[in-house]
Amino acid sequence: MPPYVFIRNDRVTEQPTSSLKEEDKGGRQGPAVPGWRHKHVMPTFTDEAISYIQRNKQSPFFVYMPLNAPHTPHAPGDAFVGKSKLDIYGDFMVEVDHHIGRVMDELNRLKLSDNTLVIVTSDNGPETNMYPRRSKFGHDSSSHFLGAKRDNWEGGHRVPFIARWPGVIAPGSKCDTPFSLVDMMATFAEIMSVELPEDQGVDSVSILPLMQGKNGDYRGSHAIIHHSSSGRFAIRRGDWKLLLHAGSGGNGYGAGKRSSRYKGTIEQKSFKTANRQLYNMRTDPDETTNLIEKRPEVVSELTALAGEYVRKGRSTPGPRQKTVLQSWPQLDWLPKKPTNFRPEKP
C-alpha cells in the first residue's frame, strides 16, 4: 500500500516524491520514491537481513525478517516468473524459498548455523483466493482444514512452523502439540534467560520444552485464545476448541462463494446457523461436527475460562491488566454484569 518507501529506524529513507501507477497484480496507485519497483522489495529486505547478520556475527543477534510476499502486489523477480508452473502467486512463493535459502547460506558461510535458531512460519492461514486456485491447480494451501485467513476456523490459524536449531531440535522431528505464535515472546525470553516484566507477554508461554522434544501439555491448564479479523473470539484447550460466535468470525462465505470452487465453506454445512461452535480437534480436525449441544459441560467450562481471561486481561498467571469491557461488542457471549460494573484496575 502507498506510500511506497522504505523505513529505517522510524524514518523514511527517501521522500516519496514520485507517483506509481498500478504496476503489478494487486498493486495500488499512490506516492512512491523515484524508481520504485515492487519486484525489488523482497531482495532488498533479504540484503538488509544478511548485512545485519554480517555486522553482528561476533555477538548474539536477533533478526525478524517479515517478507512482502505473498501479499499483494504480486511481483516476483524476473528470474522467478514461470518457475512455479502455476501462476504469478506461485512464482512469488518460489522466490520466498530462494531468499530464505540466501539467509541460510550466509549463516553457513559465516559458520553460525550450528549455533543459530532459525524459524520459518506465517502469521495466518492462506487468503481466500486459495479456493479457486485449488480448483484450477489442485493445490490446497489450507490442506483439508476449514476456512482461510481472517477466520477462527483451523484454516485461518493453523500455519507451517519450521524450526532448525542443531543440538536442541532433533533433525526431522515433529511436534504434534498445538501452540501459538504468541508463545514466541516467552520462548525467546527463556532461551536468553530474561525474565519478562509482569505486564508483558501476558498470553505467552515458552515452547522451549517442545523444541527440546518434550511433547506434551506445555501450557498446563492455560488455554490458547484465537481472534478473528472481526474481533470474534475462540478458545482452545486440550482437544477442545470453542468458537464464541456463528460462522467463520472473519470472511463472509455468501452466495458468491457457494460454487464448487469454494467447496468446504461453512454455508454448505448443516450447522451454519449455530451461534457457537464446539469441536473436538483430535477426532474432528476438519471441524465438521458441531458438538455445542452434546457437550454443554465443555462449553460452560471454556466460556467461563475465556471470560476470566478477558476480565483479567491475560491468560497466564500474574497481576490483572487494565481491561475495557463496556464498548466491546464482540463480548456478547460474556455473562452480563450489573450496570455499575467497572473492571478492576491492575
Describe these PLM feature segments.
Residues 184, 237, 249, 259-277, ...:
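Long, internal low-complexity/basic segments
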